[in-house]
């Protein structure tokens, strides 16, 4: 990893977790030294918005760096004739599993575009289930709030011509006002087979976080390693290329 190779005073062991909310709790309570946490979850933790039973102090959460973005991606087959997200009203679409980050993003989109279960057929499918449903013709479009390219969507794009649906500028501005942790993100042309132009969407940064209990020297060493080893860390991972963006 970038940290192990760039900062010899520490060694990082990787463990699979149950998601950002659990990672927040583990970091603050000392069960984990560092963890990957989505920007929106970190924001909610800092503002004590994660659950009414949380006993930890969200102000103890500290970000060491932004590692990669995850963003809103609506995919459809080119033959559908769809071009914009606002054309999904009246269609059959997958909005993500209940309480997932994809579902939360879908909800903000639907509120902006006046889409609901009355005027549109909505399915709460997981990301890979959504891709399968689109392939089988059960839905017209699938939504992913994840890294780009998302593997299951990339496989679809290799099988049939796809389009990434676009947001209009005023729609993006309205969506971004709903969540201060979201930002404008560009999916570069060529991320998916057949994607001919950049797609402007919204998303969030995934942060490497620790607690304020970590000593300053160690925190600085880890952050410095992330910066200096960015080129090595992003090698072969297109969605992590933004780590090298100094802006």
Question: Predicted regions: what is each one?
Answer:
Residues 1-13, 28, 59, 231-247:
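N-terminal hydrophobic or amphipathic helices and topogenic motifs
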Residues 1-44, 53:
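N-terminal (or domain-start) structured segment
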Residues 1-6, 10-13, 66, 70-136, ...:
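Bilobed "Venus flytrap"/periplasmic-binding protein-like clamshell domains
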Residues 4-8, 28-32, 47, 79, ...:
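Sec-exported extracytoplasmic/periplasmic mature domains
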Residues 7-9, 19-22, 29-32, 58-59, ...:
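Extracytoplasmic
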Residues 39, 49-50, 80, 116-215:
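Pocket-lining segment of extracytoplasmic ligand-binding domains
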Residues 54-67, 191-200:
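A structural signal for short loop-to-beta-strand junctions that line the ligand-binding cleft
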Residues 197-247:
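Segments of small-molecule ligand-sensing domains
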């Amino acid at each position: 990893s970038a940290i192990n190779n760039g900062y010899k005073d520490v060694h990082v062991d990787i463990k699979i977790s149950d998601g950002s909310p659990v990672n927040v709790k583990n970091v603050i309570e000392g069960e984990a030294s560092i963890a990957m946490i989505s920007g929106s979850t970190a924001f909610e933790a800092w503002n004590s918005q994660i659950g009414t039973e949380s006993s930890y102090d969200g102000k103890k959460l500290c970000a060491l760096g932004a590692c990669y973005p995850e963003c809103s991606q609506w995919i459809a087959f080119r033959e559908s004739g769809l071009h914009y997200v606002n054309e999904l009203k009246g269609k059959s679409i997958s909005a993500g599993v209940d309480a997932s980050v994809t579902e939360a993003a879908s909800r903000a989109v639907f509120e902006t575009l006046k889409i609901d279960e009355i005027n549109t057929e909505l399915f709460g499918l997981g990301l890979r289930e959504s891709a399968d449903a689109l392939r089988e013709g059960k839905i017209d479009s699938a939504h992913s709030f994840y890294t780009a390219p998302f593997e299951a969507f990339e496989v679809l794009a290799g099988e049939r011509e796809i389009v990434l649906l676009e947001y209009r500028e005023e729609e993006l501005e309205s969506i971004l006002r709903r969540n201060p942790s979201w930002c404008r993100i560009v999916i570069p042309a060529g991320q998916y087979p057949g994607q001919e132009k950049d797609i402007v969407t919204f998303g969030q940064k995934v942060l490497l976080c620790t607690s304020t209990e970590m000593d300053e020297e160690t925190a600085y060493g880890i952050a410095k390693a992330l910066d200096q080893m960015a080129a090595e860390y992003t090698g072969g991972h297109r969605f992590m290329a933004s780590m090298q963006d100094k802006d």
